[in-house]
Swiss-Prot record:
Sn-glycerol 1-phosphate binds at residues 171-177, 203-204, 225-226. Belongs to the GGGP/HepGP synthase family. Group II subfamily. SUPFAM superfamilies: FMN-linked oxidoreductases. It comes from Methanosarcina barkeri (strain Fusaro / DSM 804). This is Geranylgeranylglyceryl phosphate synthase. One of its GO terms (cellular component) is cytoplasm. Its cofactor is Mg(2+). Keywords: Cytoplasm, Lipid biosynthesis, Lipid metabolism, Magnesium, Metal-binding, Phospholipid biosynthesis, Phospholipid metabolism, Transferase. Its EC number is 2.5.1.41. HAMAP family: GGGP_HepGP_synthase. One of its GO terms (molecular function) is magnesium ion binding.
Length: 247
């Protein structure tokens, strides 16, 4: 499966993509697979697997394997470092945290991880990763110089730099469990400069209203993760979010 082409096809046909983020450190591999299956029943298009801390090694491998046993949508690694790679996934967001002060998150982890991606033939999807206030755990771990919420022009120039460096996707991240999502003004400003390049938005998207607001502002893909760990009916919550963004 060519994952990037698959996601593009969904955008062409349905307008937007919904991605479910599962952190292997938050539950057992078996429970992760149950969440993934419930999300797929709700209409999610792919499963992202990763987290800021603890998502590596045997736990990561077992989580990917269990999820793939349950669902047939793409599994995409969302690594916090080079340790967050698994040869069992379909693809990886091969990303650079452009607004990190730590070169490790800008390029060193990528250099260390590239051989495994090459050898295992996981599909790399190039991505500029940008962390916006409040940033959450990922902002702290990644030593990010957070982009202020009220400075959409800063996010836009970072995104433009990523585009000119050849990155296909840009991800605006407010941080897992953020109290509110990226504001529409910033999403719109970034999408304007990206043009046909794809914009992912995540963090703080907890209901249909927030999802629709982000999608309408210009997000091509919406990510939800934390809220799915908190609700009893994952299928219903995902269906609510998906129906808000798809045409």
């Amino acid at each position: 499966m060519q994952v990037e082409a698959h996601l593009q096809k969904i955008i062409d046909q349905e307008g937007k993509v919904h991605l479910t983020l599962i952190d292997p450190a938050s539950q057992t591999p078996e429970r992760a697979a149950e969440i993934a299956l419930a999300a797929v029943k709700g209409g999610t298009d792919a499963i992202m697997i990763g987290g800021s801390t603890g998502a590596s090694g045997t736990l990561l491998d077992e989580t990917v394997i269990k999820i793939k046993e349950k669902v047939d949508v793409p599994t995409i690694l969302f690594p916090g470092s080079s340790a967050g790679l698994s040869r069992y996934a379909d693809a990886v967001f091969f990303m650079s945290l452009l607004n990190s002060r730590d070169l490790g998150y800008v390029i060193t982890n990528q250099v260390m991880g590239a051989p495994l991606v090459y050898q295992s033939q996981i599909e790399p999807i190039s991505m500029a990763y940008l962390i916006v206030e409040p940033g959450g755990t990922v902002g702290w771990v990644g030593d990010a110089k957070l982009i202020p919420r009220k400075k959409p022009e800063l996010a836009a120039v970072y995104a433009l730099a990523g585009k000119y460096l050849g990155m296909h996707y840009t991800y605006l991240e407010a941080g897992s469990g953020a109290d509110k999502p990226i504001n529409p003004e910033m999403i719109g400003a970034v999408k304007k400069v990206l043009g046909e390049n794809k914009l992912i938005v995540g963090g703080g998207i907890r209901d249909a209203e927030a999802a629709k607001l982000c999608a309408s502002a210009g997000a091509d893909m919406i990510v939800t993760g934390t809220v799915l760990e908190e609700v009893r009916d994952v299928t219903a919550k995902v269906a609510e979010l998906v129906s808000a963004i798809k045409r």
